[in-house]
Amino acid sequence: MGNMAKGYILSAHRSPADSKKRDAYTKLAIPALEDAGGKFLAKAAKVTPKENGINERTILIEFESYEKALAAYESEAYQKALKVLDGGADRDFRIFEGV
């Protein structure tokens, strides 16, 4: 039996976030995602955009599987963080399976 593909969350901001809302969200989101098994691989404020990319914050989080990444997003703890963010960030937010 082969190894299960890892799951990932990628959050790429399209524009600067509301700093107060982002800070309140971060205080809840980081522990919620880490408690769900997430490992932060990148929290990049330094970005070099290419091919229509945007020079904004990019986050990459790894999970044991796609299902665990999806469950982390849907968790009660993370949903509380999203409520605090309350539209304070315009992001391209994706949950995907690795190879």
Predicted features, each with a name:
Residues 1-57, 64-70, 74, 97-99:
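Short S/T/G/P-rich N-terminal loop/turn motif that feeds into the first structured element of a domain
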Residues 69-94:
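C-terminal structural segments of small proteins and small subunits
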